[in-house]
Amino acid sequence: MKNTAIEKLSYTEVTKNISQAEYDQTQEEYILSKSPDKYMISLPVKVLMFEGAEDSSPFTYYFYMENDEDLYLMQRKRNGSVVDKTKIPLTKEQGQKILDGDYQFLLDSDEPLLNSLYFQFTVNQLHPLYKKECTRKIFHQNRFLDEIVDIHIVRTPFEEDKDFFATHDKMLKGGTKN
C-alpha cells in the first residue's frame, strides 16, 4: 500500500465560557461593524468524542466535521484554559473504517499520530462515546484572533444513533439540548 503525505495542523487556543449577555454584545458588535476585516460566519459542526478503557491519557480524541464535508481526527490536550490541538484530515471512508473497527490503515500510515491512534483503538479500546452537534459562530477580529462560540448544542449518546455521517438536519432532530 502506497503511503501519502498527510497535511497535519497543530495549534494552541485559549478557552473561556461567556455569558449570554457577552455573546449578544459580541454578535451585535460584529453585525454593526463597518470594518471589512471584522466579520462573522456560522458553520454547522459535528463532533464525535472517543473514550478509552483507561482515563489516564492526557489526550482527548475526536472526529470533527464542518459543513457535513470536511472530516478531521483531532487530538486535544488541555492545561487549564490553554488547549493544544492537532488535527489530521480524514476521508469519510477512513472515518467509517474507524467506526467499523478496521484500524489497519492507521498502522500503515507514515504519520506517527495515526500510528499511535492504532494502539489507542486496539490496546486502550478507544470507542465512540457521544456526538455533539452545534452551530459554530466565528467572530473574526483580525488575522491573529478569532472568537469562537458554539450555540444550539445537542449531545446524543453514540449508542442511540450510530450514523455519525448523517446530514446535519437529520442529526438535530434527536438528542438532548445543553
Which residues are covered by each model-predicted region?
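Phosphate-end processing signature that detects enzymes handling 5′-triphosphorylated RNA
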Residues: 1-178
